[in-house]
């Protein structure tokens, strides 16, 4: 799914084994360092399959079927994007 040539993957995890934080739109899985691997629903919908741990260098490959993912929430015509001016 993703072009991860040269990336060292710690493990492969089925998405069914991960927990989904609906409020944040993030799938999580425990990391050996004590933190959690994380990948957003948006990344998965973009067919990216590498979840990273924010506390260490470990990464996992998430095994999933694109058709089985929850549909992203719709929040207006802008697709949830809000323009920001500097």
Swiss-Prot record:
Location in or out of the cell: Cytoplasm; Nucleus
Catalysed conversion reaction: [3Fe-4S](1+)-[protein] + Fe(2+)-[Dph3] = [3Fe-4S](0)-[protein] + Fe(3+)-[Dph3]; 2 [3Fe-4S](0)-[protein] + 2 Fe(2+)-[Dph3] + NADH = 2 [4Fe-4S](1+)-[protein] + 2 [Dph3] + NAD(+) + H(+)
Principal place of residence: cytoplasm
Domain DPH-type MB, chain residue ranges per copy: 9-65
Keyword Oxidoreductase on entry: yes
Gene3D superfamilies the record matches: DPH Zinc finger (3.10.660.10)
Secreted found in the keyword field: no
Domain of life: Eukaryota
Entry binding sites for Fe cation: 31, 33, 53, 56
Pathway stated in the Swiss-Prot or TrEMBL entry: Protein modification; peptidyl-diphthamide biosynthesis
GO MF: ferrous iron binding; iron chaperone activity; oxidoreductase activity
UniProt xrefs under InterPro entries: DPH3/4-like, DPH_MB_dom, DPH_MB_sf
UniProt keyword list: Cytoplasm, Iron, Metal-binding, Nucleus, Oxidoreductase
Co-factor requirement: Fe(2+)
Quaternary context: Component of the 2-(3-amino-3-carboxypropyl)histidine synthase complex composed of DPH1, DPH2, DPH3 and a NADH-dependent reductase, predominantly CBR1.
Domain notes: The DPH-type metal-binding (MB) domain can also bind zinc. However, iron is the physiological binding partner as zinc binding impairs the protein electron donor function.
Biological function: Required for the first step of diphthamide biosynthesis, a post-translational modification of histidine which occurs in elongation factor 2. DPH1 and DPH2 transfer a 3-amino-3-carboxypropyl (ACP) group from S-adenosyl-L-methionine (SAM) to a histidine residue, the reaction is assisted by a reduction system comprising KTI11/DPH3 and a NADH-dependent reductase, predominantly CBR1. Acts as an electron donor to reduce the Fe-S cluster in DPH1-DPH2 keeping the [4Fe-4S] clusters in the active and reduced state.
PANTHER family membership: DIPHTHAMIDE BIOSYNTHESIS PROTEIN 3, DPH3 HOMOLOG-RELATED
Protein name, entry field: Diphthamide biosynthesis protein 3
């Amino acid at each position: 799914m993703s072009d991860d040539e040269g990336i060292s993957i710690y493990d492969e995890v089925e998405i069914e084994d991960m927990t989904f934080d609906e409020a944040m739109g993030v799938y999580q899985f425990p990391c050996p360092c004590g933190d959690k691997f994380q990948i957003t629903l948006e990344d998965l919908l973009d067919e990216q399959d590498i979840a990273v741990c924010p506390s260490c260098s470990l990464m996992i490959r998430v095994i999933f079927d694109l058709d089985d993912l929850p549909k992203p929430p719709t929040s207006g015509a802008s697709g949830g994007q809000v323009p920001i001016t500097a």
